[in-house]
Regions:
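N-terminal chloroplast transit peptides
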Residues: 1-24
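Intrinsically disordered Ser/Thr phosphorylation hotspots
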Residues: 15, 31-32
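Cysteine-centered motifs
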Residues: 27-31, 38
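Long, positively charged leader/targeting segments at protein N-termini
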Residues: 43-96, 100-108, 125-128, 136-464
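Intrinsically disordered, low-complexity polar regions and short flexible loop motifs
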Residues: 113-114
């Protein structure tokens, strides 16, 4: 095929590196932090640091202490002595009354886990300002609630709530404009997942937040919600004995995170009876080595929307190449110059889907497995990584691995020309201009959106 010769060439694994964006609290990397306020404890707050260090030392049996990375000067937890693989660092009870953990209680049927935890944070902060009890103010959960960053975190929250009084005149109108413009940005970038996640979140929080009535209360609630989304762990019962729930654990929140698996040296689990949350060493850890948790498999969109930064490196970032198997196969049919009504191709496509288990059997016949996550199978990731489903489908329909890879390269070039041409760049900059002038969005958030788009461009370029 002529198109195959045109795109078959030696692959280069290198590409221009994208901008590094990350949080000093949540992400570990080797360049200066972009957002210093994301650290849980501000440098210079000696009393806060002393209180937290005492908690860390006590509850880790002197295995860990607060310290600073010599290169980045980012605060984190460091090994106070050598720690063996599988050795426990923290063992935190998941009882509601335990002072070391916030647990969503779902006592109010109108609240989901995020609302439950946000209200607990606000209650602790409120009580600390009205109580004369010094012991209560030093209690870990109260100290934690008061040490959280004052700024609202995450673009999703800044689209759904009042943002630190930066919006003028008609706040509701400005907020809605910001939300719509960010949705337009995701549309222009072709990031359907990010747009859907933002829309789902806005719908989820809008009715709940409006119940507060007063602007000041809504602002506080939005702030608390923004803290909760980037600091919780999901607890699931493998035996199905109870519904999943979320927890916030102040001591564990002091750990920095990484998306680079080689840097991760601690992991977490829940006891089988769901009675405790445990952090343990993933491998042997040397004295004075920083303790690092993994972010897990998260796309950049989640960090952008809810964490307020992008990891310096994220092997789990991706670009969607096709929505589903039908779009992929129809595109390939067109690439080969076949008529869209060609019955021979219809039979080939059906056979391909059947062979790969992408059809489910029903009494009335076969139908496409239209799982909501199907489109996440057809993705490109950093370092020119093509997901297995894409390769399997294209190999099956073409019968040749080189042709499958060549087809992916053609598709990547096509997406670049459709979403990242000079006209597209100009359109994106117009959106940014409106965000700055009409909604007073922070310049740093604009740069974050720009970096997100550039990283997607880099992923596409790497495969070509």
């Amino acid at each position: 095929m002529a198109w195959l010769k045109a795109v078959t060439r030696t692959h280069s694994s290198s590409s221009p590196s994208s901008s590094s964006w990350y949080s000093s609290r949540r992400c570990r990397c080797r360049c200066p932090p972009r957002i210093a306020h994301c650290a849980l404890l501000k440098k210079g707050k000696a009393d806060d640091e002393k209180d937290f260090d005492e908690f860390v030392t006590k509850h880790s049996n002197a295995r860990a202490s607060i310290g600073y990375d010599e290169t980045t000067h980012v605060r984190g937890l460091f090994a106070s002595r050598e720690i063996k693989a599988k050795e426990e660092l923290f063992h935190v009870s998941l009882a509601k009354e335990d002072e070391r953990v916030f647990i969503d209680n779902n006592e109010n049927e109108d609240d989901d886990w995020s609302a439950s935890l946000a209200k607990q944070i606000l209650m602790k902060r409120r009580r600390s300002t009205t109580s004369d009890d010094d012991d209560e103010k030093k209690e870990l959960k109260t100290a934690y609630a008061n040490a959280l960053p004052k700024e609202m975190i995450g673009i999703a929250n800044k689209c759904c709530f009042y943002d630190d009084n930066k919006m003028n005149k008609n706040k509701n109108s400005d907020r809605r404009t910001r939300y719509e413009l960010v949705c337009k940005f995701f549309e222009a970038t072709g990031d359907r997942d990010a747009k859907e996640e933002l829309m789902k979140y806005e719908k989820q929080v809008s009715s709940r937040s409006r119940r507060h009535g007063e602007e000041e209360e809504e602002e506080k609630y939005g702030w608390a919600l923004s803290q909760v989304f980037s600091r919780t762990f999901r607890i699931e019962d493998a035996r199905g004995r109870r519904a999943p729930r979320r927890v916030m654990i102040p001591i564990v929140d002091l750990l920095n995170h990484s998306s680079v698996e080689e840097e991760v040296n601690v992991t977490w689990r829940v006891k089988e009876d769901l009675s405790a949350f445990i952090v343990e060493a993933k491998r042997n850890v040397g004295k004075d080595e920083e303790l690092i948790l993994s972010y897990g498999e998260r796309n950049d969109q989640h960090f952008l929307l809810f964490y307020g930064f992008l990891p310096s490196m994220n092997p789990c970032n991706s670009v969607m190449v096709w929505e589903n198997v039908d779009e992929c196969l129809n595109w390939y049919q067109n690439l080969c110059g076949a008529d869209e009504n060609d019955t021979k191709w219809d039979a080939m496509k059906y056979k391909c889907k059947r062979a790969l288990g992408l059809l489910k059997k029903k009494d009335e016949g076969d139908f496409i497995d239209d799982d909501n996550d199907e489109r996440r199978r057809f993705i490109l990731s950093p370092n020119a990584k093509v997901d297995n489903t894409t390769l399997l489908v294209l190999n099956e329909i073409s019968g040749d691995n080189d042709m499958a890879i060549a087809a992916v390269r053609v598709r990547a070039e096509e997406i670049l020309s459709q979403r990242f041409a000079s006209d597209d760049d100009a359109n994106i900059e117009r959106i940014f201009k409106h965000l700055l002038e009409e909604t007073q969005m922070d310049e740093s958030d604009i740069e974050l959106l720009r970096a997100d788009r550039n990283r997607k461009r880099d992923i596409l370029r790497e495969i070509i």
